[in-house]
């Protein structure tokens, strides 16, 4: 079973969906994330088995959305795919 997941989000305009890449070691996960980042993708490393939770993403103008993600980094990537203005992230427990 993999120990890490690399979540990747394609750059705007790419005809691709975000997806997870399983990795068995941290060094491999870092290499995978860096390889995608070098091509303009956003990427973050997540411990395997981390559950999805709701995160609240807010803009300075007060607009907010809920994002289902495993980590704050993943929530940030997902919310900023909607708008770069989201700059405040808080877990909704």
Give the role of each language-model region.
Residues 1-18, 46-64:
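Short aromatic-glycine-(Arg/Gly/Cys) micro-motifs in beta-strand/loop hairpins
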Residues 23-47, 68-90:
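A short, charged, amphipathic alpha-helix used as a generic interaction element across diverse proteins
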């Amino acid at each position: 079973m993999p120990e890490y997941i690399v979540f990747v989000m394609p750059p705007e305009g790419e005809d691709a969906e975000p997806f997870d890449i399983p990795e068995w070691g941290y060094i491999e996960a870092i290499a995978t994330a860096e390889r995608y980042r070098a091509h303009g993708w956003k990427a973050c490393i997540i411990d395997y088995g981390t559950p999805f939770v709701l995160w609240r993403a807010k803009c300075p103008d007060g607009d907010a959305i809920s994002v289902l993600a495993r980590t704050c980094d993943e929530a940030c990537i997902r919310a900023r795919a909607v708008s770069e203005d989201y700059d405040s992230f808080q877990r909704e427990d």
